[in-house]
């Protein structure tokens, strides 16, 4: 599952990594969490960019889920391009059936388009649920099927 962080403030007065969600971004992420609660029964692993806005998006979503999810905050997701993110996903343990990745555009949008051959755009707060059969290490562009997509 790929998640683009929800709408963030345009200027934090500090670093880009410190930008927080706007009030509407928080509400959007909570709405997405409610939408996901009816579609997911578990998540084996969750990765989020260490940027504040991505972490806040994950937290707002996780609060609405009916199961606990522990997140791994990853610095490498902040600057990752689509090739980099695909390589990281390929390194996921095969015991992970459901992987949640919260990140940034253009990376999330491009990876979703590569994996599913569906280039629909990826607005702030959007979520794509993809299915893939096989070991993570074998995941290549065009191998996944987009089964659900929502925009808050």
Regions found by a protein language model. Name each.
Residues 1-76, 80-84, 119-122:
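Active-site-proximal alpha-helix that buttresses catalytic centers in soluble enzyme cores
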Residues 6-7, 52, 77, 105-107, ...:
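Short, flexible active-site-adjacent loop segments at beta-strand->alpha-helix junctions, enriched
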Residues 39-42, 92-97:
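Glycine-rich phosphate-binding loop signature in dinucleotide/nucleotide-binding domains
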Residues 86-92:
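Short, surface-exposed amphipathic charged segments that create phosphate/polyanion-binding patches used
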Residues 96-114:
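A glycine-rich beta-strand to alpha-helix segment
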Residues 118-152:
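Domain-level recognition of soluble alpha/beta enzyme cores
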């Amino acid at each position: 599952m790929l998640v683009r962080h929800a709408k963030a403030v345009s200027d934090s007065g500090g670093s880009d990594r410190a930008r927080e969600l706007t009030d509407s971004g928080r509400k959007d992420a909570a709405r997405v969490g409610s939408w996901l609660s009816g579609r997911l029964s578990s998540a084996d692993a969750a990765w989020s960019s260490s940027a504040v806005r991505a972490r806040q998006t994950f937290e707002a979503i996780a609060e609405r889920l009916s199961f606990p999810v522990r997140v791994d905050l990853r610095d490498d997701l902040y600057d990752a391009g689509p090739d980099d993110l695909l390589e990281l996903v390929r390194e996921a343990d095969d015991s992970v059936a459901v992987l949640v990745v919260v990140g940034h555009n253009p990376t999330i949008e491009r990876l979703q388009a590569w994996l599913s051959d569906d280039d629909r755009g990826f607005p702030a707060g959007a979520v794509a649920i993809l299915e893939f059969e096989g070991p993570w290490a074998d995941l290549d562009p065009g191998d996944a099927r987009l089964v659900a997509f929502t925009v808050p």
